[in-house]
Amino acid sequence: MENDILNEELNDTATFTPTDDERFAEKAIIKVIGVGGGGGNAVNYMYKQQIPLVRYVVLNTDKQALGTMDVPDKIILGYDITQGQGAGNNPEVGRQCAEASVDDIKKLFDKDTEMVFITAGMGGGTGTGAAPVVAKLAKDAGMLTIGIVTVPFQFESEQKILTALDGAKEMQQYVDALLVINNENLTTLYPDISLFNCFEKADDTLANAARSISEIISEKCFINVDFQDVKTTLKDSGTAIISSGEGEGENRVTKAIENALKSPLLKAHDIKTSKRLLMKFSCARECENPITAKELNEITVFTSSLPKTVKVKWGIADIPEMEDRIKVTILASGFDVTLRDGEDKGDGPITFSSEDNAQKSKKPEKPDTDKEAAIETTYGTGTMKQMALNR
């Protein structure tokens, strides 16, 4: 079939043999799979970072987009359906294309793979429709399966936002943990970002989330956190978040933690409502001011402020380039989430809010109110009014 020929042209993904690129570990226990345009761009960005223990794969219905990727391992989805022309922003077409390529996708989940990241931008056709199919196949194969997805900027239209939230809800059914990055929060982080750069920044943010978790596993720690700690934190955990922050000078450990927790990317979550918390501190052993035992008390002060229901594990990695700075990466999981109306278990987008926010949600009196609640919970009060003004 022509689909097989195209796969061979892009890469011999049908057998998933190692490529000639020797930058990565021979036994890669982590696979990072980018689905669709946004997911593919994020994985292409990660591929250039040379993270050990990781292999990368990009999947798309768009042959031309795949051709621009540096990642050697590629699968074109559903060629017989779209002839490589993309899903046309139709998630149903994206789903059908993934289902038509199930045999190729299954071959990605070999015996050496222990953890799979699936990255996608929600709201379009391929990412929204195909990513949940890929996630289900990974989970069914026994992989620790993590979804990392973005939802659109506010200016991208109400319909695209609702499509994205539907896709995220579908994705959540088939992963151990789902990290949702709201692109609109990037406008707080980068208030002067140009329209031409905002989508690139969204792809970078998607990549950084997957990279941060991968680095927890791959970087050697002298107070250890490892793959099993990540697995314990994320296995069947529902919704998760990841953030990082840096500190320097006096109270640098506390500053790093505070900066991580102040990230707009954590906007909808209170760390105290999580069930598991994994923290990795990165600092230089050989520097002018190496971390002291006294500074570790700053970690204890923070962890002691959390409810006893939050299970905490932390470690320290020696990263020479940090010099006198300290960086913390925080991975938290097990947040209580609610469907958009708080009760209905039927079809519809999910909102990703902490238990505190969930208690404030009310069942809508009409379907349109349900949609409005989904958007307002995810994007903030007043969003619908602002979107109406922008029309």
Task: Enumerate the predicted regions with their spans.
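Tubulin/FtsZ superfamily GTPase core signature
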Residues: M1-R391
